[in-house]
Regions:
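Short N-terminal micro-motifs specific to bacterial/archaeal maturation
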Residues: 55-56, 82
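Short hydrophobic/aromatic beta-strand micro-patches
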Residues: 8, 56-58
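Short S/T/G/P-rich N-terminal loop/turn motif that feeds into the first structured element of a domain
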Residues: 1-51, 63, 67, 85-89
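Short connector loops at helix/strand junctions that flank enzyme active sites
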Residues: 49-52, 75-77
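Conserved short beta-strand edge segments in small beta-sheet-based binding/regulatory domains
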Residues: 75-87
Length: 89
């Protein structure tokens, strides 16, 4: 099942801001958790001025993605929406 994950952070918690390097290991840990859970990344996009990241993931359900956000610690820096989606092609 495909899921659109929308991750938002504030300018203050932006990973590109000096002093916010602590978020980088969280993002790496999330990707590692997803890989280990067999979740396939279809695509990733960023809108830096809006402080929003978009991911399309193929996962059995949204709970796996939610667990990755929690286990990685990324939830402490972002808000997330996990939406099941389907192609309109």
């Amino acid at each position: 099942m495909l899921h659109m994950v929308i991750l938002r952070h504030s300018p203050e918690s932006c990973p590109g801001r000096p002093g916010n390097e602590a978020i980088h290991p969280c993002a790496n840990a999330m990707q590692e958790f997803l890989d280990n859970a067999g979740v396939k990344t279809i695509g990733r996009w960023a809108d830096p001025p809006a402080h929003v990241n978009y991911l399309v993931l193929e996962a059995p359900d949204g709970h796996v993605i939610q667990e990755a956000l929690m286990e990685s610690g990324l939830f402490a820096y972002t808000t997330a929406e996990i939406r099941p989606v389907m192609s309109m092609d």
